[in-house]
Regions:
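Juxtacatalytic substrate-recognition/specificity segment
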Residues: 1-107
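Hydrophobic alpha-helix feature that most strongly marks membrane-spanning transmembrane helices
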Residues: 84, 88, 146, 168, ...
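Short glycine/serine- and small hydrophobic-enriched flexible loop segments
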Residues: 116-123, 186-197
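Acidic/His/Gly-enriched intrinsically disordered linker/tail segments
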Residues: 88-97, 101-182
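Feature representing long, continuous alpha-helical segments
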Residues: 74, 135, 182-189, 193
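Residue-level detector of conserved catalytic or cofactor/ligand-binding positions
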Residues: 202-210
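Surface-exposed helix-capping loop/turn segments at secondary-structure junctions
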Residues: 12-23, 89-91, 123-130, 195-202
Length: 210
């Protein structure tokens, strides 16, 4: 039921008039339960997810636990990619040759904005409250500020260098490379706040509306 609420909310975000997913009536979530690993990989009509067993809900839980909320945001993140990345994508990803790297300086937008909305849309679906949303955003802020590299590398550089740095971490990564996921999410948060401040009535979420 919770995942259904998420999919309906994401569809409403991108398709307020049509009310349908571009993948059609069938979309498959493949969840692999692990000991510790977590992540996801989006496809045009499905997504492959990995989540620790502790993220799964228990029948005796009286409320959604922090671990379960992480699972919900993972579902939201990968489903959001059905539009942003699979349908709306950087030029380098169009007709890309998957046997080699595809470089782009825009990963911070595609992954960062998705990371921001994974929390915002779970909140919009009514699955968390404002307090929990604030904790999720603050967690990203804390992680970025405490990473020395956030003052040494731009988001566009972090995106372009992903193949040689982000995906090949070293002992010096904390000093040399930022997460375009988390720092990109903060960029979306700041942009959203600035739009709200200046317009008094609009927000970043209005980009989904005609």
């Amino acid at each position: 039921a919770d995942v259904k609420k998420i999919t309906e909310t994401v569809i409403g975000f991108f398709e307020p008039k049509k009310g349908k997913c571009p993948a059609g009536d069938e979309y498959t979530f493949l969840l692999n339960v692990t000991s510790n690993a977590a992540g996801g990989l989006e496809h045009a009509n499905s997504t492959a997810l990995a989540a620790p067993r502790k993220w799964l809900p228990c029948t005796h839980d009286k409320k959604r636990t922090d671990n379960y909320v992480q699972l919900l945001t993972l579902f939201a993140h990968e489903y959001f990619h059905t539009w942003l990345v699979k349908r709306i994508k950087p030029a380098a990803f169009i007709d890309a040759d998957f046997s080699e790297e595809a470089y782009t300086s825009l990963l911070w937008l595609f992954e960062g904005f998705t990371s921001y909305y994974e929390s915002m849309l779970v909140r919009r679906a009514g699955l968390i409250d404002d307090e929990v949303l604030g904790k999720l955003l603050s967690k990203d802020l804390k992680a970025v500020v405490e990473t020395p590299a956030h003052m040494a590398q731009s988001l566009s550089q972090a995106s372009f260098d992903a193949w040689i740095k982000f995906y090949k971490p070293s002992a010096n990564s904390v000093n040399a490379h930022v997460s375009y996921y988390r720092q990109g999410a903060l960029a979306a948060w700041v942009l959203d706040a600035e739009i709200r401040r200046k317009t008094k009535s609009l927000s970043l979420i209005h980009i989904s509306e005609p």
